Amino acid sequence: MGYKNSDNTNNKFSRKSMSPSLTGGKGRKTVGKKVKKTIPRKTVNWSSYDVNSDSNEDSDEESENENDSDNDDEDDDETEHHHLDGLYSLMGKRPHDSSSNGDDDDDDDDDNDNKNIFSSTSSDGDSDEAMFSSSDDDSDVDFVKLQAQQKAHALKIAKARKGLKSKPKNESNDNAIASSSESESNSESDNEDDDDDVVSLKKLKPRKKSFLKYGRRRSDAVLPDINFKFEFDTGENDELEAGNQETHIKEPEEEDIGEEVDYSPENPVDSNNVPSLEFEFDHHLIEVPKINEEELNSDEDYEIDDNELLATLQAENDAEEFLPPITKGNSQPQRNDSLISSTIEEEENDNDNEEASKGGDGDDDDDDDDDENDPFLKEEEKYLVNEFETNGFDENEEDEDEDDLHTFDSDFSTTNRIVNSFKGIGEDRSKPIVKYESSVSGGSDYDEDDYIDLINFDVPLFDDKNGHLDGGKKNSHHKGNTDKLKKDKVKQRANSNHNSDEDDDSYLWNYFFSSDNDSSSEETDDKNNSKTVNKSRKNKKNKKALTNNAITGADELFEQIENDNTFKSKSKSNHHGNSLYKAYSDSPMTIQDLEAEIRAGADDDDDDDDDYDSSESTDVDESLPKSSSNNSLVGSSKKATEVLSSKTADYRPPKLGSWVTVDCKPFGVIDGLSTRTLQLNKSQEPRSAAQSGTSHSTSIVNSSNGSGLGLPTTSIASSLAANPRKSIVVGPTNVPSSMISSDDSALGLDELLNVSELDNDDENDVKIWRDFNNNQNKKKIPLGAFRNKSVLYNNHIYQDDQHHHLHRRNSNADKKFNGSGHIKKQQPIRRQSQSKIERRRASIVEAVSQGYRPTKSGLFSETALADVEELLGDDRDLMELIQGL
């Protein structure tokens, strides 16, 4: 807008009305300063702000204001009014009420001019109340001056705000006022009072000053800066507006909210609403079906129909087989031909059943819950019955017809090609390695040789060249079987297609039946194995398909397995090196031939079967001659052998501590059960040679004070006199070293393990043991005979030991007291024994006088014993027992 220098008076109100548009709807307030009404030093060119007005009238009026320099105040006010409305509509906001701004100027202006100016400013001031916190930028605001203005004009603003109570509706409707048109702003300005006109007139002058003061610096600023001024000038009147808003905020809430929002947190909850909510709480719960007790207790759910059970199980098992897998594109799923034919039949049956079920749904709505009306079970039943009646598990003809109808586009994928290549291995050696089982016609568009590269087999077994390597013998045998294989393959391929890819693991048979593929010398066996695999694979597929040829196929399978085992046994005999395998597999041999073979292969056995042990028997066959290697190792045989003595009648239990080494027995005990052969020459034993120079104390193994169990001294002396080469292993300490033969070297471990059977001269033990082994007299000899003997023997050793220790104590006591006071321990023992005997005799005399008979078992009454003798007088054995007591 352009202004002339001579027209200060006419342009005064135009500048006042324009200033809110540049200062954000509020004039900048200064304290104690008045700006002279001079010519603005810089004009505002609105073309540089790139303002897009709502209508073309704003641009026309801007051009009129630039070119028009007349003194018509009304025209200037109207054009600026339209211009301000256009700016505010672009910003989406309204400036705050001009009456909220305090003023320091008391300029005298005409009332007509005030009314005209108020029309443009009162509409702007009415909507300025909605300018709360719409911007976040405070970089262009001088807060120090704002606080000074707020403190100085707080009282005047409070008086000037008395007219705002009549218009609370304008504050609540921010969006409506922000988008209001020019006519609405004019209608609002007409409703204002005369007092508001005076107040609005006073507010225009500080806008002019602030425009002159601050507008020079920001004349080139874009519209977003103006938005920031709109925002932060609202903070001046926060304190005053807070009290006014509290008074009239509830009025629009009562009108707007009213009946719709009764449960708002501002309104207290009525006591009548609480029981209503509790009453309706049960209705909002999830509806749980109520089941009668009769239905729970009934046994109908547990009654299972066999036909329905079979149909359900068949449906569950065949769900994955009959349903085609999800494939990408238009390619059909890779399935066997029988499966695809069955799925086509099933889909046809499903469509028929669905149409029938749709037609009958209207009549059978009440019976849908019953198992009889289950459409899925009906479909399965119908399908199974039709299949059993028509096909009877035999789908050979249908599968052969359908092989030409179905093509497998998905077979070109890498995984499927590899899997199918495994299936074709070894079926027919005259054809390529990879061939799809479902394509009987053989008319495939792809090159089958490409699949050979995918499978890295090191075996030259399946090449066609191998058929010409071994001469006419192999070729004639091969030709005889290829014709048979071709016939079987055509018949059995359709049945094998019934199995899914997951169940068909027949390609793994090649690994189990061709274990000797690495050696090139066994190609004959490999070919036989491959033929066996071909037949066994087909027989296995026949079993799975449950065809009529299953029984004959099983017989062929077992026959081929037996033939294959014979081939394997021969192949093992070639590279094992042991003639035993060949001997048992080829032909029966005589014992002489077998011995000759064993002698010839003794060296090979040492190399190959050195660590071999059958672990099935502990006996050695003595009919076979011993090898030279075994003859050199007599005492270190690796096999444990058990040798039993023939003298079972004279066997006696060995006594502990009486083990004596002997030279007459070549066997020693290892663990009480098994025995091993000892060396005949003791000088070869390294232990005995190393210990030959040791003293005789090593011959006494257990000689601590003679406390261990050992032979009596008499038996030891007699045994040493009888056999001077015997050495005592366990014995008392008083055996002199001269009794041990000096020519006998130290005992070896083998000698300590020898068992002495009949060396003991105690004839009593021999007699007792023989009587014990005798079945006739076994009952009469109790086991206490051995126990009593051992007790008496141990008693004798214990008494000797006590006497020995007593003698040592007495000798020590003599040395200690030097003969002054001799302590005799035997006298009180004799006195105690004499006193016991005397008391016993006195008690016996007293018992006899009272009528009792003393026996070994105690005192018995004479009358009782007399009654027993009268009653049992005829039984002599019992009487002897009683009298012996």
From Swiss-Prot:
Residues 375-384 have a biased composition (Basic and acidic residues). Residues 1-138, 150-201, 234-275, 291-410, 465-639, 680-708, 813-835 are annotated as: Disordered. One of its GO terms (cellular component) is nucleus. GO terms for molecular function: transcription cis-regulatory region binding; transcription coregulator activity. It is found in: Nucleus. Residues 55-78, 102-112, 125-138, 185-198, 252-263, 294-308, 344-354, 362-374, 392-404, 603-622 have a biased composition (Acidic residues). It comes from the Eukaryota. Residues 1-22, 115-124, 328-343, 689-708 have a biased composition (Polar residues). Keywords: Nucleus, Transcription, Transcription regulation. One of its GO terms (biological process) is regulation of transcription by RNA polymerase II. Residues 173-184, 626-638 have a biased composition (Low complexity). InterPro entries: TF_CRF1/IFH1 (IPR018837). Residues 26-40, 153-167, 534-544 have a biased composition (Basic residues). Induction: Induced during biofilm formation. It holds the Pfam family CRF1. Interacts with FLH1 and TBF1. Belongs to the IFH1 family. Transcriptional coactivator that together with FHL1 regulates the expression of rRNA and ribosomal protein genes. The FHL1-IFH1 complex is targeted to the ribosomal protein genes by the DNA-binding factor TBF1. This is Transcriptional regulator IFH1.
